[in-house]
């Protein structure tokens, strides 16, 4: 029975309020593909990614960011990222495709619409999107940067072709770097850490090269590794792909350190069972970054811990994180308190 979707999507709150307050600060919401709590709970994976987390922590400290981390339950495992996206964006628990398609027929208010109603430009960065996407109208984005819009001129890496670092560089150049603009709500679904986790693009330190006509020269050796991996090789590639996207978060913190945004980076689901294990919990890490400590106070009050290493406590489900984001964004104006 999914009638509850229509019952809650037309709540009095949505009709009467319809806006949020974040002091016109940008909000970057990054879903890191296949970033599950197995990276912390499996000692082998944690040993691999720990240097990347330490580097991210150093970048955050250098550029004046405070950090907090928690664990949330995802509605899916090993795939079907769109279910987690829809759950967080709407505050409804969307755990099946039936629920998802039913949701699209409702007038549920998404995070994009909340911020858009407050004067924000709502954008989606979806480098893995290569087809028509009617769902975009439901979410209410002003602009969807799909694979075609990103105009990637380089070699294809893996199944999804476009490296996340290129996507971020292109998007920031077109949207985030503009001085005189409306505040930005940005949803970014990464793809480089998608199964099969290779070949992995090199990290480019010289960002202007990413926006040149040849963003990845001399990668023949990397591309020769574009085969099927199994067992330990697959697990190693998974760790390396996660490190890549952790580096991507570092890049975003550096790029935007002069703009004081709120950055939320989280997993969409655990990796497949061959990586996480068949009995792994359906949980994902959530990292919050802000240069204003008071912004993190509400997350800390909800059980988040300081830094990038979560404790083992699951704080709730991703539909509940939706409300926490609204409460945090609107803390100075009004506290949202509704049930889904």
Please tell me what each predicted stretch does.
Residues 1-3:
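Fold-level signal for large, globular catalytic cores of enzyme and receptor domains
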Residues 9-340:
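Solvent-exposed soluble domains appended to multi-pass membrane proteins
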